[in-house]
From Swiss-Prot:
Known cofactor(s): Mg(2+); Mn(2+)
GO molecular function term, any single one: tyrosyl-RNA phosphodiesterase activity
Organism of provenance: Rattus norvegicus (Rat)
UniProt-annotated stretches for the region Interaction with 5' end of substrate DNA: 126-130, 232-237, 270-272
Protein name: Tyrosyl-DNA phosphodiesterase 2
UniProt xrefs under InterPro entries: Endo/exonu/phosph_ase_sf (IPR036691), Endo/exonuclease/phosphatase (IPR005135), TDP2-like (IPR051547)
Region annotation Disordered: where it falls in the sequence: 1-30
Site annotation Interaction with 5' end of substrate DNA: residues: Y184, W303, F321, H355
């Protein structure tokens, strides 16, 4: 069951000197990134250009759009298309061949049948595709983690089209199912020969302001039926009410699966513990993997601006945004370990994402 006291206390103490300012800074960064994405989608420009117009117009979208469309066509100082060196998700071709790129996943395409092992593993990770800075190197960093850990399933959030194309080319031993094809979206990767795809469903969140939904994928693992789910719930404290409604939808969908189906949800929930309490807590038959394992401190915070400076937020904020929920017949699925990944800086000096990834291993008891 969800326990709010310890996490709430930790959140209220971060940072101790000025919690209000820290939260405002955090929300502002996320809001502006989403605002830049929306501007880019409307204007078909790069998000770096979008951010420039918005910042020069005090982040007033209508004013920025007017400035963009009213600029002279020969104004070379403000190209609609970024220069070829721009590190933008819309224009950096992540699929280009690179002779030095060793991140192609070359494990056996047939995989190892689950019947030979009672352990499954998966990664859940918000890979921050909306950040165009150093995107090719960060994408290679993510693929390096996939190659290193070779999980059976990967749950991803904040995937963009060019990033998805890169994954399809580099992660050849995985089938990739996405929650959308435009803007930014979620994806679930299934190891070929190990996880058999049976079907998918996308559940819309009707009141989302951020293009969010719930991606459900039905699979077979060693003869056992699984329903795998991922989502990127509404961001920032301002949208707490919508986030709680989305969480209720997740729990409702988890309950709809047949009793013999094991359900795993893993994703970026953006949750604060008090919101789980406001939602009524976890259903009696749904468990939080981190809590099940005794709330290990080493993997508590998946979004930590003090340890991870990708966003360059001055204040220190840390949250357990990325969570894993599971529902299984009693004793049939037992979490064994949970660890953070993506903790090492890349050559560019940044991390693969502003979120740490979670690597989870579980025992399947037949």
């Amino acid at each position: 069951m969800a326990s709010g006291s310890s996490s709430d206390a930790a959140e209220s103490a971060e940072p101790a000197a000025a919690p209000a300012a820290a939260e405002t800074e955090e929300d502002q960064v996320k809001r502006r990134r989403l605002q830049s994405l929306g501007f880019a989608l409307v204007t078909s420009c790069d998000t770096t250009v979008a951010s420039t117009f918005l910042s020069e117009n005090n982040w007033q979208t209508k004013k920025a759009l007017s400035a963009f469309f009213e600029q002279p066509e020969n104004d070379l100082a403000r190209p609609h298309q970024p220069p070829t060196s721009s590190k933008s998700e819309d224009y950096v071709d992540l699929t280009n061949e690179d002779a030095n790129d060793t991140t192609i996943l070359e494990t056996s395409p047939s995989g190892t049948p689950l019947e030979d092992s009672s352990t499954i593993s998966f990664i859940t990770w918000n890979i921050d595709g909306l950040d165009g800075c150093n995107l090719p190197e960060r994408a290679r960093g993510v693929c390096s983690c996939l190659a290193l850990y070779s999980p059976d399933v990967v749950f991803l959030q904040e995937v963009i089209p060019s990033y998805c194309a890169y994954l399809r080319k580099r992660a050849r031993t995985y089938n990739i199912i996405t929650g959308n094809e435009e803007g930014y979206f979620t994806a679930i990767l299934l190891k070929k020969g190990r996880v058999k795809f049976k079907g998918q469903e996308i559940i819309p969140f009707p009141n989302t302001k951020m293009m969010r939904n719930l991606l459900c994928v039905n699979v077979s693992l060693g003869g056992n039926e699984f329903c795998l789910m991922t989502s990127h719930l509404e961001s920032t404290r301002k949208h707490s009410a919508e986030r709680i409604n989305q969480l209720k939808t997740v729990f409702q969908k988890m309950q709809e699966a047949t009793d013999s189906t094991t359900v795993i949800f893993a994703g970026d929930t953006n949750l604060r513990d008090q919101e789980v309490i406001k939602c009524g807590g976890l259903p009696d038959n749904v468990f939080d993997a981190w809590e099940f394992l005794g709330k290990p401190k080493h993997c508590r915070y998946t979004w930590d601006t003090k340890a991870n400076d990708n966003l360059r937020i001055p204040a220190a904020c840390k949250h357990r945004f990325d969570r894993i929920f599971f529902r299984a017949e009693e004793g049939h699925l037992i979490p064994q370990s949970l660890d953070l990944i993506g903790l090492e800086r890349l050559d560019c000096g940044r991390f693969p994402s502003d979120h740490w990834g979670l690597l989870c291993t579980l025992n399947v008891v037949l």
